[in-house]
Amino acid sequence: MQRVRVSSQRAVVHKLGDSQMTLSPKFRVAASIQSTLFDRSSELELSLRGEPLIPGLPDDVALNCLLRVPVQSHVSSKSVCKRWHLLFGTKETFFAKRKEFGFKDPWLFVVGFSRCTGKIQWKVLDLRNLTWHEIPAMPCRDKVCPHGFRSVSMPREGTMFVCGGMVSDSDCPLDLVLKYDMVKNHWTVTNKMITARSFFASGVIDGMIYAAGGNAADLYELDCAEVLNPLDGNWRPVSNMVAHMASYDTAVLNGKLLVTEGWLWPFFVSPRGQVYDPRTDQWETMSMGLREGWTGTSVVIYDRLFIVSELERMKMKVYDPVTDSWETINGPELPEQICRPFAVNCYGNRVYVVGRNLHLAVGNIWQSENKFAVRWEVVESPERYADITPSNSQILFA
């Protein structure tokens, strides 16, 4: 049993960018399209000639307004004038300006696969305007199993990493690492992991990316772990796990990496779980109550660990570290439109649960009198996503 992450909404689907893909001997790497039209010197020349972005407004005020225009309106907006064409002509220019002005809106990136063709594809939901967009395909030569790889993100930097995985129809793990930059709408191939692995634990702690355990060739379980420094792109080993183990779900809580293998049929043995503290570079066994009650996909909200149950029509629950137990939170169960498998992520006090066909449930969580509660809203996906099953999801800001 493995886990994932995703999202949904009914709307026209737009291209997030116009990147072209070129083929190298092993990988397809995105190449940006450039034109003299989008040169900064052209923008400077037009502004010096006194052509305003919006007549009657200072440029800084006008730009502050235009940077709020939804992406789906860019095609029509760029035909207004040359300066608007420079701003809306490429998503790289637009998002670079938004970053410069400090805009940080959330976008939900969902990776799923077609139940008809098995093709892996990323879909992106603008969480402000609830519109769907697309990004270039990951530059992988081999056909990859949609569940074996792991993705992590640096939300505030607008970057995402996809690591490891497994070649479809084989037990061959991968050491591949891909990086996606939202501002550039661009995938790059980065330094490989030390150990090829699939179905492993991954998480980001203090800006460092950790990978632990998982499956090697022939589904042999690993105990080795490693960490990536995104600033220099280098992986280095860290302490081995207490036991060889693949990961069912992972969470980062209080600066520690929590890893559970989940319940395995026929449920004769309690699931194993381990906790890694990067400050001491030590692993320890997870408490019994935490690992035995971990029966779904986790999110961390209000510095507490919440679970969306493995089963449909179940209520969320939250872990109490004082009593080492789980308790159900108030509010309705997951809406009936959301069917397994689930892809789960969170932002602020909201949890995003994407189900089959990319229908999305948004849960608003709050605390009252020491008891948590949730209220659900459903966002239906476009009909064209009717054959997509979610595998993973991340949230980036741009």
From Swiss-Prot:
Alphabetical GO CC annotations of the entry are: chloroplast
InterPro entries per the UniProt record, alphabetical = F-box-like_dom_sf, F-box_dom, Kelch-typ_b-propeller, Kelch_1
Q: Where are the Kelch repeats?
A: 106-152, 159-207, 209-255, 257-304, 305-346
Matching CDD domains = F-box_AtAFR-like
Coiled coil, from the record: none
Keywords (alphabetical) are: Kelch repeat, Repeat
Gene3D superfamilies, sorted: Kelch-type beta propeller
Ranges for domain F-box come to 51-98
A Pfam family found in this protein is F-box
PANTHER family per the UniProt record, alphabetical: OS02G0202900 PROTEIN, OS07G0153400 PROTEIN
Task: Return the protein name.
Answer: F-box/kelch-repeat protein At1g30090
Q: Which organism is it from?
A: Arabidopsis thaliana
